Amino acid sequence: MVKKNFIPSVSLVRRDLPTLVTTTTSSTALSKPTSSVVSETSSKSLPSLTSSAFSTSSGATSSSSLIVASITPPSTAGNPFILNAADKPNGTVYIAVGAVIGAIFISILIWWLVSSYLSRRFTMTNSYANDSKNLYRGHHKHSSSLQSNPFDINDEKSYMQDDWDSMSQLESSQYEDAASPFNPIQDPFTDSRRSLFISPTLQVSQYEKSHSRHQSKDTNIFIDDPSLYVGTYLEEEEEEERKLNLNRPQRAASPERKEKKINSMEGYHKRNQSSLGLIPVASATSNTSSPKKAHKRQAPSMFLDDVLNGREII
């Protein structure tokens, strides 16, 4: 491709004309008449001319040519290394990146919604389970733990604690004749003792018997209604043992103190040297002491082990 440029030329000319001197010499030949030669010299000076004019030459033209190459990309037909983007929209890369970022944000939002829903559902389930376990009380309004007044909850807890305290006091009232909880092997009649005689075997046996008796009382308490059941079990045998322990033993170091467990009436007759009513009491004591005589064949250590384990009662 040839491109022609026409550039107009503008020139500024200033010049002076040179001074011209002309000398003319003429000679005339004399003819017959006499003539004089006239020599004429003339000097003529031309005026100086100054001309300043802008002249535009329309006829003078200058031409220049510039060659520009055209770039043609290769064809994508059948070329696996060139992406054919003719059928793709503009900004495909930006669309793909935006889609990935949006998917990440949507997944985070879904995870938050699911976790909050599961947490609320678990909390509601636990609160309903706890509310169903609580006992209904007339002065308390039964409502969910999520909607109830915290002051009402504290009042209900204190009321339940008072109920448990009353239950513990009811149970402890059944054990008024028991040993001290700080010392499991303790004689319950230490304060009222009038003798210096101490029998560890007798104390252990008394503790085992009282413990078994209290266990039976516990089963009876839990079987019956604790709010209506109030009572103490004072058996005749316990009263006799209590009266017997208050008495001074006849022989302080007697090896037969295991067989000194007799009826209170018999001890009364012995102290007062009375034989009234001894025959039926003796028959009763002989019947009760008959199985104990079989233990005379055992070693003392074996008998003590049986007493400690609760298999034997002194």
Curated annotation (Swiss-Prot):
<dbReference type="InterPro" id="IPR051009">
    <property type="entry name" value="PRM"/>
</dbReference>
<keyword id="KW-1133">Transmembrane helix</keyword>
<dbReference type="GO" id="GO:0005935">
    <property type="term" value="C:cellular bud neck"/>
</dbReference>
<feature type="modified residue" description="Phosphoserine">
    <location>
        <position position="148"/>
    </location>
</feature>
<keyword id="KW-0472">Membrane</keyword>
<feature type="compositionally biased region" description="Basic and acidic residues">
    <location>
        <begin position="254"/>
        <end position="269"/>
    </location>
</feature>
<comment type="similarity">
    <text>Belongs to the PRM5 family.</text>
</comment>
<feature type="modified residue" description="Phosphoserine">
    <location>
        <position position="274"/>
    </location>
</feature>
<feature type="region of interest" description="Disordered">
    <location>
        <begin position="32"/>
        <end position="60"/>
    </location>
</feature>
<protein>
    <recommendedName>
        <fullName>Vacuolar membrane protein EC1118_1N9_3125g</fullName>
    </recommendedName>
</protein>
<dbReference type="GO" id="GO:0000324">
    <property type="term" value="C:fungal-type vacuole"/>
</dbReference>
<feature type="modified residue" description="Phosphoserine">
    <location>
        <position position="254"/>
    </location>
</feature>
<keyword id="KW-0597">Phosphoprotein</keyword>
<dbReference type="GO" id="GO:0005774">
    <property type="term" value="C:vacuolar membrane"/>
</dbReference>
<feature type="transmembrane region" description="Helical">
    <location>
        <begin position="93"/>
        <end position="113"/>
    </location>
</feature>
<keyword id="KW-0926">Vacuole</keyword>
<keyword id="KW-0812">Transmembrane</keyword>
<feature type="region of interest" description="Disordered">
    <location>
        <begin position="240"/>
        <end position="309"/>
    </location>
</feature>
